[in-house]
Amino acid sequence: MKVLYTSDLHGEIHLYHELLSLAIASSSEVIMVGGDLLPSFPPTKRYEDMVPNQKTFVDQFLSPLLKRVLEATSVRQIFLIPGNWDLGYPHLFKESMEGIIDLSQRSYRLKNGYELIGYPFVPPTPFRPKDFEKMDDKEAPWPPQKNPSYIRSSDQTDQLTPIDPYPYLRGRETIEEDLNHLPKPLRQKRTIYIMHSPPFGTRLDLIQGGKSAGSRSIKTFIEEHQPLLTLHGHIHESPEFSGAYLDRIGETLSINPGQFTWASRDVSKLHAVTFEMEKIEETLMHTCFPKVRSD
């Protein structure tokens, strides 16, 4: 089964058009998008306009495009999770769309017997939207927070509620706790996890200065459960700084394709990978990086 994976498109229309072109060129059967699908900031740069702008993007562009992908290509299923900027994500599923599947904290068994499991949350960032942020674990350090930060009041309203991020995040379950409650697959060696945050301390989570910004709990989860493959995003620039878009944690292959990084200033080329699910390493290709070894 041919898979196309990307992440962090942030409402960039030209990247979505490239996604459609790549789906056609690669004859992909499944598309997976690992979060941050929607525009981060509205043209007004006002947080109160963020959700209405994202909903407009969904209605006028994204939903029609995804339907077009399913109609005009060999793609039969599109799996999505939100990222930390996707406060308007529930609007994508206001109506059922055949072939477009919300994988957030859910599992899905494909016709070939492989299982997909999605997880959207990331450790605290310096940014203000907090719907999809949680403490990594009770001891993990945080970056300085901006006060006020914002959460969406509910899925039924566009209103954002200002919050003090420190008590808000301390009052939520941690990523570590969440991961223990994810659906349990039948066989880890035939399971692919789509997680917006990359694992900490790998070649997939490097930011400027060589610091790691991924999730310690996600790395521990991968070490302990050893799934076939994990797919990530969030840290756009990591492949640029580490020189690699894949890493190995035990026997698990982990991938962060990156996206239009500030280091290269290349915003015109979609960062994505394609592969055959039954022989991932032999067929893995990146749109911007040469084929590399994972060991």
Predicted regions and their residues:
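Active-site environment of divalent metal-dependent phosphoester hydrolases
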Residues: 10-14, 38-42, 80-92, 108-110, ...
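Active-site-proximal segments of metal-dependent phosphoesterases and phosphodiesterases across multiple
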Residues: 38, 45-59, 186-226
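Extreme N-terminal starter segment of soluble prokaryotic enzymes
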Residues: 1-4
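Active-site-proximal loop/helix segment associated with metal-binding centers of metalloenzymes
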Residues: 114-208
